[in-house]
Amino acid sequence: LRAFAQRRDKKLAAHAVRFDKRWSPTITVRPMHPNPAFRQTSRDRNLAFSRARGFGILSVNGPDGPLAAHVPFLLSEDASFADLHLARSNPLARADLPGPALLAVSGPDTYISPDWYGPHAQVPDQVPTWNYVAVHLRGVLEPLPPQALGTHVDELSAEHEQRIIGKTPWTSAKMTEGAKDRMLRMILPFRLRIVAVDGTWKLNQNKPPEVRARAAEALAKGDAAAQAIAALMREKPET
């Protein structure tokens, strides 16, 4: 197992050097949703949402088809990259990297019934739909040197610990000697260098204001996700 880890670490270092030499794939960026009404949110808000969420689905093209992993991540201060880690045994960690990747960050979502738009005589021929918030971070996924892992996991846990009210933040200093190193050997660090940010905030913007307001009123009586969407639907449009 140790020999495998050493071989893998050498490969990671070689990949990092290859990226430093300005290796760059061709990345074609297409809108997540074809309707421009749902793509009016600013880059800053899309990034703020992604930073606050801190969790997404990472996907790359594998030799036998798409590979995906659900990962926590830490967005850099200037939003030029997102750092994350994967289990050594994860097929995505063994993909041919650096390479194009997509990190999909999802927010609240909920079903929309046509009945909520109003009487059929006033709003005829409506169909069910789904409202949601999602941001796609596209870029180049590269392995990081193994020595970057300790700092990454400490910064990641610190970010989320400081959000918890009412307790002293947990740190890896609480772990027994050697335990952290044993666990770190089971994961690998990666960095997504962000090339494009694409957000979809599908909130019935293609409906008249009064119709949208009725749907929001109905959603406000639903579960937490429905209420979150209702609150977003009631916000004033960005200018």
Label every PLM stretch briefly.
Residues 21-31, 140-239:
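C-terminal edge-of-domain segments
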